[in-house]
Amino acid sequence: MKKFFIALMASVALVGCGKDDNNDTGIQEGAFPKKITSTYPNSNRSTVTTYNIQNGKLLSATITEYENGVQTGTAHIIKAEYLGDRITQMKYGQPSAENYAIKDYTYDGQGRVIKETRVEPHRTTENGDSYTQEYRYEGGQLTKIIRQNPTTNWINGERKKVNRHSESVLAYSGSDIIVNETVTYRDGNGAVVTGTSTYTETTTYTVAGGNLIKKIEGERTTEYKYDSNINPMPLNALLRTTMPDYFLNEDYSKNNLIEEVDSYTDYQGKLVKNIKSIELTYNSKGYPTMKKTFRQRGSETKTLQMIEEIEY
Protein backbone atom coordinates (compact mmCIF):
# COMPACT_ATOMS: atom_id res chain seq x y z
CA MET A 1 0.00 0.00 0.00
CA LYS A 2 2.85 2.40 0.80
CA LYS A 3 4.40 1.90 -2.65
CA PHE A 4 1.10 2.76 -4.33
CA PHE A 5 0.60 5.80 -2.13
CA ILE A 6 4.03 7.17 -2.98
CA ALA A 7 3.51 6.72 -6.72
CA LEU A 8 -0.03 8.05 -6.53
CA MET A 9 0.83 11.17 -4.60
CA ALA A 10 3.90 11.77 -6.74
CA SER A 11 1.61 12.73 -9.60
CA VAL A 12 1.09 16.10 -7.94
CA ALA A 13 2.33 18.80 -10.30
CA LEU A 14 5.31 20.81 -9.11
CA VAL A 15 4.55 24.32 -10.32
CA GLY A 16 5.65 26.29 -7.27
CA CYS A 17 5.37 25.99 -3.51
CA GLY A 18 1.76 25.97 -2.46
CA LYS A 19 0.52 27.38 -5.76
CA ASP A 20 -2.62 26.12 -7.47
CA ASP A 21 -2.61 25.71 -11.25
CA ASN A 22 -5.43 23.89 -13.00
CA ASN A 23 -4.24 24.09 -16.60
CA ASP A 24 -4.11 20.30 -16.75
CA THR A 25 -6.49 17.87 -15.10
CA GLY A 26 -5.48 14.44 -16.36
CA ILE A 27 -2.68 11.93 -16.62
CA GLN A 28 -0.24 12.44 -19.49
CA GLU A 29 0.05 9.37 -21.70
CA GLY A 30 3.38 7.66 -21.23
CA ALA A 31 4.32 9.64 -18.13
CA PHE A 32 2.55 7.62 -15.45
CA PRO A 33 3.59 4.03 -14.69
CA LYS A 34 1.31 1.20 -15.72
CA LYS A 35 3.32 -1.32 -13.73
CA ILE A 36 6.11 -1.25 -11.12
CA THR A 37 7.97 -4.41 -10.11
CA SER A 38 10.03 -4.10 -6.93
CA THR A 39 12.53 -6.77 -5.89
CA TYR A 40 14.63 -6.92 -2.73
CA PRO A 41 18.05 -8.58 -3.31
CA ASN A 42 18.63 -9.27 0.39
CA SER A 43 15.48 -11.38 0.60
CA ASN A 44 13.30 -13.55 -1.61
CA ARG A 45 10.43 -11.07 -1.67
CA SER A 46 9.02 -8.94 -4.49
CA THR A 47 6.04 -6.68 -5.09
CA VAL A 48 4.13 -5.94 -8.31
CA THR A 49 1.92 -2.85 -8.53
CA THR A 50 -0.36 -2.34 -11.55
CA TYR A 51 -2.36 0.82 -12.26
CA ASN A 52 -5.78 1.07 -13.90
CA ILE A 53 -5.90 4.31 -15.91
CA GLN A 54 -8.96 5.25 -17.95
CA ASN A 55 -9.73 8.52 -19.75
CA GLY A 56 -6.81 10.25 -18.07
CA LYS A 57 -7.86 9.20 -14.57
CA LEU A 58 -6.17 6.80 -12.20
CA LEU A 59 -9.07 4.63 -11.01
CA SER A 60 -7.32 1.94 -9.02
CA ALA A 61 -4.12 0.10 -8.21
CA THR A 62 -3.49 -3.52 -7.35
CA ILE A 63 -0.54 -4.48 -5.15
CA THR A 64 0.53 -8.13 -5.14
CA GLU A 65 3.33 -9.50 -2.95
CA TYR A 66 5.43 -12.57 -3.73
CA GLU A 67 7.90 -14.79 -1.91
CA ASN A 68 10.11 -17.12 -3.94
CA GLY A 69 7.94 -16.23 -6.93
CA VAL A 70 4.74 -17.41 -5.22
CA GLN A 71 1.98 -14.96 -4.34
CA THR A 72 1.52 -14.41 -0.61
CA GLY A 73 -1.92 -13.49 0.68
CA THR A 74 -4.59 -11.59 -1.21
CA ALA A 75 -3.79 -8.75 -3.57
CA HIS A 76 -4.41 -5.32 -2.06
CA ILE A 77 -6.70 -3.09 -4.14
CA ILE A 78 -6.99 0.68 -3.80
CA LYS A 79 -9.79 2.59 -5.54
CA ALA A 80 -10.25 6.29 -6.24
CA GLU A 81 -13.61 8.03 -6.70
CA TYR A 82 -14.10 11.36 -8.47
CA LEU A 83 -16.44 14.30 -8.73
CA GLY A 84 -15.56 15.77 -12.10
CA ASP A 85 -11.77 15.91 -12.20
CA ARG A 86 -11.28 15.93 -8.43
CA ILE A 87 -10.64 12.91 -6.26
CA THR A 88 -13.19 12.88 -3.46
CA GLN A 89 -12.56 9.49 -1.87
CA MET A 90 -10.01 6.68 -1.78
CA LYS A 91 -10.74 3.18 -0.48
CA TYR A 92 -7.91 0.92 0.68
CA GLY A 93 -8.46 -2.84 0.71
CA GLN A 94 -11.59 -4.92 1.21
CA PRO A 95 -14.40 -3.58 3.46
CA SER A 96 -14.24 -6.68 5.68
CA ALA A 97 -10.44 -6.59 6.13
CA GLU A 98 -8.80 -5.33 9.30
CA ASN A 99 -6.65 -2.86 7.35
CA TYR A 100 -9.59 -1.41 5.35
CA ALA A 101 -9.45 2.39 5.22
CA ILE A 102 -11.44 5.24 3.67
CA LYS A 103 -10.00 8.65 2.91
CA ASP A 104 -12.24 11.62 2.04
CA TYR A 105 -11.27 15.01 0.59
CA THR A 106 -13.15 18.32 0.94
CA TYR A 107 -12.43 21.27 -1.38
CA ASP A 108 -13.03 25.02 -1.15
CA GLY A 109 -14.50 27.20 -3.89
CA GLN A 110 -11.08 27.57 -5.51
CA GLY A 111 -10.61 23.82 -5.85
CA ARG A 112 -8.08 23.52 -3.02
CA VAL A 113 -8.20 20.72 -0.48
CA ILE A 114 -9.19 22.14 2.90
CA LYS A 115 -9.91 18.90 4.76
CA GLU A 116 -8.67 15.31 4.57
CA THR A 117 -10.17 12.56 6.72
CA ARG A 118 -8.94 8.98 7.03
CA VAL A 119 -10.98 6.35 8.87
CA GLU A 120 -9.99 2.77 9.65
CA PRO A 121 -13.24 1.28 10.99
CA HIS A 122 -11.78 -2.07 12.07
CA ARG A 123 -8.57 -0.86 13.72
CA THR A 124 -7.97 0.07 17.35
CA THR A 125 -6.35 3.29 18.55
CA GLU A 126 -3.08 1.52 19.33
CA ASN A 127 -2.30 0.34 15.79
CA GLY A 128 -4.59 2.39 13.58
CA ASP A 129 -3.97 5.45 11.43
CA SER A 130 -7.25 7.37 11.49
CA TYR A 131 -6.93 11.16 11.40
CA THR A 132 -8.42 14.47 10.33
CA GLN A 133 -6.20 17.04 8.62
CA GLU A 134 -7.15 20.59 7.68
CA TYR A 135 -5.30 22.99 5.39
CA ARG A 136 -5.32 26.81 5.55
CA TYR A 137 -4.16 29.18 2.82
CA GLU A 138 -3.19 32.85 2.52
CA GLY A 139 -2.33 34.67 -0.67
CA GLY A 140 -2.30 31.46 -2.69
CA GLN A 141 0.15 29.72 -0.34
CA LEU A 142 -0.33 26.92 2.17
CA THR A 143 0.22 28.51 5.60
CA LYS A 144 -1.14 26.07 8.20
CA ILE A 145 -1.80 22.34 8.62
CA ILE A 146 -3.95 21.17 11.53
CA ARG A 147 -3.94 17.45 12.24
CA GLN A 148 -5.74 15.43 14.89
CA ASN A 149 -5.65 11.69 15.49
CA PRO A 150 -6.69 9.38 18.33
CA THR A 151 -3.92 7.91 20.45
CA THR A 152 -3.14 6.90 24.02
CA ASN A 153 -0.96 8.62 26.60
CA TRP A 154 0.27 7.84 30.09
CA ILE A 155 -1.44 10.25 32.50
CA ASN A 156 -0.82 9.94 36.24
CA GLY A 157 0.36 6.35 35.81
CA GLU A 158 -2.63 5.30 33.72
CA ARG A 159 -2.92 4.85 29.95
CA LYS A 160 -5.82 6.93 28.63
CA LYS A 161 -7.30 7.66 25.22
CA VAL A 162 -6.66 11.21 24.01
CA ASN A 163 -6.42 13.12 20.72
CA ARG A 164 -3.01 14.21 19.47
CA HIS A 165 -3.49 17.71 18.07
CA SER A 166 -0.77 19.35 15.98
CA GLU A 167 -0.67 22.74 14.29
CA SER A 168 2.07 23.34 11.72
CA VAL A 169 2.61 26.95 10.67
CA LEU A 170 4.50 27.50 7.40
CA ALA A 171 6.57 30.67 6.92
CA TYR A 172 8.19 31.46 3.56
CA SER A 173 11.55 33.26 3.39
CA GLY A 174 13.26 33.23 0.00
CA SER A 175 14.08 29.61 -0.84
CA ASP A 176 13.45 28.50 2.76
CA ILE A 177 10.20 27.26 4.26
CA ILE A 178 10.19 27.22 8.06
CA VAL A 179 7.63 24.92 9.63
CA ASN A 180 6.86 25.27 13.35
CA GLU A 181 4.77 22.36 14.63
CA THR A 182 3.11 22.64 18.06
CA VAL A 183 1.71 19.44 19.58
CA THR A 184 -0.86 19.17 22.37
CA TYR A 185 -3.03 16.33 23.68
CA ARG A 186 -6.74 17.06 23.94
CA ASP A 187 -9.97 15.51 25.10
CA GLY A 188 -13.14 15.01 23.06
CA ASN A 189 -14.18 18.63 23.69
CA GLY A 190 -10.92 20.06 22.39
CA ALA A 191 -9.51 21.02 25.79
CA VAL A 192 -5.85 20.33 26.58
CA VAL A 193 -5.63 17.32 28.90
CA THR A 194 -4.03 18.04 32.27
CA GLY A 195 -0.87 16.05 32.87
CA THR A 196 0.17 15.90 29.20
CA SER A 197 3.06 17.74 27.59
CA THR A 198 3.03 20.50 24.98
CA TYR A 199 6.00 20.98 22.68
CA THR A 200 7.07 22.76 19.49
CA GLU A 201 9.46 21.47 16.83
CA THR A 202 10.97 23.49 13.98
CA THR A 203 11.94 22.11 10.58
CA THR A 204 13.55 24.22 7.85
CA TYR A 205 13.16 23.14 4.23
CA THR A 206 15.15 24.62 1.33
CA VAL A 207 13.58 24.40 -2.13
CA ALA A 208 15.36 25.47 -5.33
CA GLY A 209 14.41 24.93 -8.96
CA GLY A 210 11.40 22.82 -8.00
CA ASN A 211 13.56 20.46 -5.92
CA LEU A 212 13.80 20.00 -2.17
CA ILE A 213 17.56 20.27 -1.59
CA LYS A 214 17.88 20.42 2.20
CA LYS A 215 15.94 19.68 5.38
CA ILE A 216 17.12 20.67 8.87
CA GLU A 217 15.19 19.02 11.68
CA GLY A 218 16.64 19.53 15.14
CA GLU A 219 20.22 18.21 15.15
CA ARG A 220 19.71 16.28 11.91
CA THR A 221 20.42 17.62 8.43
CA THR A 222 19.38 15.87 5.22
CA GLU A 223 20.68 16.98 1.82
CA TYR A 224 19.32 15.84 -1.54
CA LYS A 225 20.82 15.64 -5.04
CA TYR A 226 19.00 15.11 -8.34
CA ASP A 227 19.70 14.29 -11.96
CA SER A 228 18.93 16.75 -14.77
CA ASN A 229 16.01 14.74 -16.18
CA ILE A 230 12.37 15.53 -15.51
CA ASN A 231 10.71 13.32 -12.92
CA PRO A 232 7.70 11.99 -14.90
CA MET A 233 5.37 11.72 -11.90
CA PRO A 234 4.95 15.48 -11.37
CA LEU A 235 3.90 15.93 -15.01
CA ASN A 236 0.46 14.63 -14.04
CA ALA A 237 -1.89 17.25 -12.63
CA LEU A 238 -4.72 14.85 -11.76
CA LEU A 239 -3.95 14.68 -8.04
CA ARG A 240 -2.39 18.12 -7.76
CA THR A 241 -4.42 19.36 -4.85
CA THR A 242 -4.80 16.20 -2.78
CA MET A 243 -1.41 16.77 -1.15
CA PRO A 244 -1.01 20.53 -0.61
CA ASP A 245 2.38 20.17 1.14
CA TYR A 246 3.93 18.03 -1.62
CA PHE A 247 6.83 20.47 -2.03
CA LEU A 248 8.19 19.42 1.39
CA ASN A 249 8.88 15.88 0.17
CA GLU A 250 11.86 14.89 -1.98
CA ASP A 251 9.93 12.14 -3.78
CA TYR A 252 7.78 14.78 -5.49
CA SER A 253 10.56 17.07 -6.72
CA LYS A 254 10.89 18.26 -10.32
CA ASN A 255 13.92 16.07 -11.08
CA ASN A 256 14.80 12.50 -10.12
CA LEU A 257 16.42 11.91 -6.75
CA ILE A 258 19.88 10.30 -7.02
CA GLU A 259 21.35 10.87 -3.55
CA GLU A 260 20.16 11.53 -0.01
CA VAL A 261 22.68 12.22 2.78
CA ASP A 262 21.40 12.19 6.35
CA SER A 263 23.88 13.68 8.86
CA TYR A 264 23.80 13.93 12.65
CA THR A 265 26.11 13.84 15.67
CA ASP A 266 25.85 10.74 17.85
CA TYR A 267 26.01 10.60 21.64
CA GLN A 268 29.81 10.33 21.48
CA GLY A 269 30.07 13.56 19.51
CA LYS A 270 30.93 11.78 16.26
CA LEU A 271 29.48 12.93 12.95
CA VAL A 272 27.47 10.12 11.35
CA LYS A 273 26.36 10.08 7.71
CA ASN A 274 23.80 7.68 6.26
CA ILE A 275 23.74 7.74 2.46
CA LYS A 276 21.04 6.57 0.08
CA SER A 277 22.08 6.57 -3.58
CA ILE A 278 19.99 5.71 -6.63
CA GLU A 279 21.23 4.50 -10.02
CA LEU A 280 18.79 5.20 -12.84
CA THR A 281 18.23 3.74 -16.31
CA TYR A 282 16.13 5.86 -18.69
CA ASN A 283 13.90 5.39 -21.73
CA SER A 284 13.99 7.55 -24.88
CA LYS A 285 11.95 10.27 -23.13
CA GLY A 286 14.42 10.43 -20.27
CA TYR A 287 12.02 8.81 -17.78
CA PRO A 288 13.41 6.22 -15.35
CA THR A 289 12.69 2.61 -16.31
CA MET A 290 14.88 1.08 -13.61
CA LYS A 291 15.92 2.30 -10.18
CA LYS A 292 18.59 0.64 -8.06
CA THR A 293 18.60 1.91 -4.49
CA PHE A 294 21.74 1.52 -2.39
CA ARG A 295 22.26 2.34 1.30
CA GLN A 296 25.37 2.95 3.34
CA ARG A 297 24.88 3.45 7.07
CA GLY A 298 27.83 5.20 8.68
CA SER A 299 31.00 3.17 8.11
CA GLU A 300 29.12 0.08 6.92
CA THR A 301 29.52 -1.27 3.38
CA LYS A 302 27.29 0.14 0.66
CA THR A 303 24.60 -2.44 -0.19
CA LEU A 304 21.90 -2.80 -2.83
CA GLN A 305 18.50 -2.60 -1.11
CA MET A 306 15.91 -2.56 -3.88
CA ILE A 307 15.47 -2.75 -7.66
CA GLU A 308 12.41 -1.16 -9.30
CA GLU A 309 11.42 -1.87 -12.91
CA ILE A 310 8.98 0.70 -14.27
CA GLU A 311 6.72 0.21 -17.30
CA TYR A 312 4.84 3.15 -18.85
Task: Please provide the spans of the model-predicted regions.
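Sec-dependent N-terminal signal peptides
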Residues: 4-12
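C-terminal motif of bacterial Sec signal peptides marking the signal peptidase cleavage site
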Residues: 14-16
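Positively charged n-region of N-terminal signal peptides that target proteins for export
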Residues: 1-4, 18-19
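Buried hydrophobic residues that stabilize the cores of well-folded domains
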Residues: 19-312
